[in-house]
A protein has these predicted regions:
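Short, well-ordered beta-to-alpha junction loops that form the rim of enzyme active sites
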Residues: 12, 111-114, 154
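Short acidic/polar active-site loop segments enriched in Thr and Asp
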Residues: 106
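Short catalytic/ligand-binding loop motif for oxyanion handling, primarily in non-cytosolic enzymes
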Residues: 17, 52-53, 116-119
């Protein structure tokens, strides 16, 4: 795109119905809308790209251990009935990294709280609606590879960071 920074964005934030419950979490952020109109956004849902259906059971990282522990093989991602969906989440994270690399992405805006995309907090692994500080698997992999990740509630911070890249 000739010097225009591309931004990886959770597809659910752009209105795509890819969430576990079959819904979207469409953002009404003006900056995201502007970047979308400029063609900067690279929509991506790691859970769907990893092979999980829509809708699907919710999943959480056991013990709220965080994405880095999953990447290291020290934690799993489980549904409330105990089904292990770790491999699908890892596959989606690897595909997100590949999409970021192929698009020249150095910044991402992802859905906070998600076991894939959370950047500051994730659910604690008890399936009781409680959160804990931590990152999702995709966020952890992207950050390990130099892509800076922001939650959807930190778009102004992402914009400031974006200015340092250009």
């Amino acid at each position: 795109m000739g010097g225009v920074e591309r931004i990886l964005v959770s597809a659910c934030l752009l209105g795509r119905r890819v969430r576990y419950d079959g819904g979207a979490k469409t953002s009404d952020d003006d900056l995201l809308a502007r970047w979308r109109a400029e063609g900067r956004l690279v929509p991506f849902c790691p859970e769907v790209e990893g092979g999980l259906p829509v809708p699907r059971p919710p999943a959480e990282i056991e013990g709220g251990a965080g994405g880095a522990a999953v990447l290291a093989g020290e934690a799993r991602i489980l549904t409330p009935d105990g089904a292990d969906v770790t491999e699908a989440f890892l596959s989606g994270a690897r595909q997100a990294l590949a999409a970021a690399r192929s698009s020249g992405v150095r910044i991402a805006i992802l859905k906070e709280g998600s076991p894939s995309c959370g950047s500051l907090r994730i659910y604690d692994g008890t399936h009781r609606g409680r959160t804990t500080p931590g990152q999702g698997v995709t966020t952890a992999l992207l950050e390990l590879n130099g892509v800076r990740v922001f939650g959807e509630d930190r778009v102004p911070d992402a914009a400031r960071y974006l200015e340092t890249l250009t």
